[in-house]
């Protein structure tokens, strides 16, 4: 028999999925929130800029309710949850008052290392970071306006403090032959799990056209292989140069510099 919402709630098996901010620092061309035709890769004009406050969250979800929830997925269809100014306090409220687990999905190129260290000290939190390249150029091809080295610095700060980091990588043609290299890089900076997913945003053909940050025409290309699982990619030794796989010396220097970045939350995208 199909279980209803109330059945899961009463059993303590309900999993919550929340979108707590429509703000985002990135400008991914195939994202639902991105205006890819007018230039600048800003948000669509019809999308209101809103975010939940801690007080709104506490009013909506009492401590009694928290204790009936198995887990929280704090994601973002139309924004990045780490752009929410009260995200840490919301997570702290959940963790302090229940045994619920929390998973946060983010591009990771937001906040400074000190903030991520603080988040990592909260028990029961996992974060999924978006890493799609081994260089800034490769990362920025889709994850526009993000900084690979800042993401890696934040991920390392989070995991060094005790947090668990996972990485999700969206596959396009520009990164399809670098997946194992990306995985190796992420694991050097604290990731314990690496998942890849072929982009499903090519609705009208193998290219998505857009106008970039500088007003120039550009396009994304769909991956031309089958990436349902890692085994279908082929022999990793034939794809990855393992002589350069484990050190990433130049990247390490840039990650160290990014670790000292200031918190840029005052300049939220509008």
Predicted feature descriptions by range:
Residues 1-126, 137, 141-149, 153, ...:
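Conserved alpha-helical substructure of the radical SAM core
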Residues 102, 165, 194:
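Hydrophobic anchor at the start of a short beta-strand
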